[in-house]
């Protein structure tokens, strides 16, 4: 049981052990220089977004103080080249979690490759979501062009540990 008292105590013990190894002083972790440096890097709003190019868009998963669970967003090449590109939200994980009453953690996406000559298609994706950040995920088919979950005969894998690939 992942949420049992015994399991949570084990996790807390391993976290403490790791913190002692990384930050050997007795001061709180927040006072450690490495902690501050890492936070500065991860929270920098000017960091260059890593993108996946599909069709006419560049896609990026982004987290910040306004999007704690994250948003999946897109922009065009022209916008991406600008100092402050405009992004369009495609999927908001925070809003999804609130709407569904689940503590969703985004675990990635797979673009559905349609085969030779179809490289510009960007509509089909499967998204992996984990409740509470566990190793198990559910996989749902998402239409990026419509910005919504596929409801008619969708690809779906219920919560489990698995690997997914697309074969047409």
PLM segments and residue spans:
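Beta-propeller folds
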Residues: 1-168
